[in-house]
Amino acid sequence: MAGKDIKYGVKARESVLIGVNTLANAVKVTLGPKGRNVLIEKSFGAPTITKDGVSVAKEIELKDKFENMGAQMVKEVASKTSDVAGDGTTTATVLAQAIYTEGVKLVAAGGNPMEIKRGIDKGVEAVIAELRNIATPTKEQKEIAQVGTISANSDETIGNIIAEAMDKVGKEGVITVEEAKSMETTLDVVEGMQFDRGYLSPYFVTDPERMEVIMDDPYILLVEKKVSNMKDLLPVLEQVAKMGKGLFILAEDVDGEALATLVVNKLRGTINVAAVKAPGFGDRRKAMLEDIAILTGGQVISEDLGIKLENVTLNDLGTCKRIVTDKDATTIVDGAGDAAQLSSRVKQIHAQIADTTSDYDREKLQERLAKLIGGVAVINVGAATEIEMKEKKGRVEDALNATRAAVEEGVVPGGGVAYMRWLDALEALHLEGEQELGKKILSVPLKSLFVRLPIMLAVKVLLLLMQLRSLKDQTVSTQLPKFTKTLSLQVLSILPRLPVQPCKTQLLYPVCFSPPSV
């Protein structure tokens, strides 16, 4: 049995601090709009190029177990920030490093760790209140594009594509990032509800050139169980045929005699019909069928509800403006469901998202929500090589996360101004004893940021600090050029491009880390 190494007091804190500094120093080179790229070696394949702090942090594992504990703590800060806000991981790492360093000094000098921690907590509350106070909602597409552009390394193309996607699908819509097959980065927006199930037989195709089933104003039959017996379908088929409309069948499966008869009737021109398997599995399939029923104004045919297929009437069928189906996917456009019921369903799914503790379930619920409101966009990232593709895709994902955070909780002044307001909030808070020392710890990370940010911008620290401290107005995009006339030309060109930052990422920085009391 392997023995355990045990360290106490100063030696333990020093080892942990080495680990904290090792990881943080590797991560913080990526800070800000002029941050550097990091090249990460892989055991197989090409290396990875990234400017994402959490991606760098996740690759670091130190040989010394005590030092590695410090590195893992800071890694957790970056990971937590990434999970909740999606961006701002490098800034969170720099702040964590500074807070730990100062906390260790106070503990080594005989400070009470618990009182110091209470001071930090009270300072955090004041900072969060101030950040929420100065946050403003993002209303215009231009503001969203600014946030996306900044997070994508000042790439305006990416910022504009993300803003366009957000504008088209809304804040509840799903935006996914995929690798393109060409060198161009493009945006594809899917109208209506789309799910990954295609037609059960190619004989249903109405457009042979595109191999698609296109149905205008069809009736939609939603069946929870498998349909194999044709006699169950005959009554509803006869009713639909009399109306001279098409019938789209969505069921667990359609096979055997039922599928064969539908194909024959389609080929003879008796009725325009198509059948597709219902999306999902188990309880998720039932939920999605109910979503489609509400969207189209229909009723799910389920024996659990006492409704049999042979007793279905036209009132039980849903309708929509158009359905397009190929061999892989189906899109329902402009369902005829009741707006009030749809709104109620959306609220119900929102509540389920808030209650769930599973990331997988949350993702699936968000997909359902996006499908219901008809918002699905795909950003196809193009590049010349695989290495460039991965790097660019990472920037797009970062920018998308920052944009979502900005839309969700608003934006705060960028270019370091929000940190100055952070400092003002701390100065206005008066605590006693060692809690005051804990509160002051939170002002130290600002110095780390103001040393690091100008290094990336190649300007003098004190000049930048003085200019930002004098800037109190929230309308930074118009005020910054006025206050930066004495700075170098490089700052004049960069700072106006940093008008806003997502408030959500700022709120997380002070709460992700506090110094241990070892």
UniProtKB/Swiss-Prot annotation:
ATP binds at residues 30-33, 51, 87-91, 415. Disulfide bonds: none annotated. PROSITE patterns: CHAPERONINS_CPN60. GO terms for biological process: protein refolding. The keyword Repeat does not apply. Forms a cylinder of 14 subunits composed of two heptameric rings stacked back-to-back. Interacts with the co-chaperonin GroES. Together with its co-chaperonin GroES, plays an essential role in assisting protein folding. The GroEL-GroES system forms a nano-cage that allows encapsulation of the non-native substrate proteins and provides a physical environment optimized to promote and accelerate protein folding. This is Chaperonin GroEL. It comes from Desulfotalea psychrophila (strain LSv54 / DSM 12343).
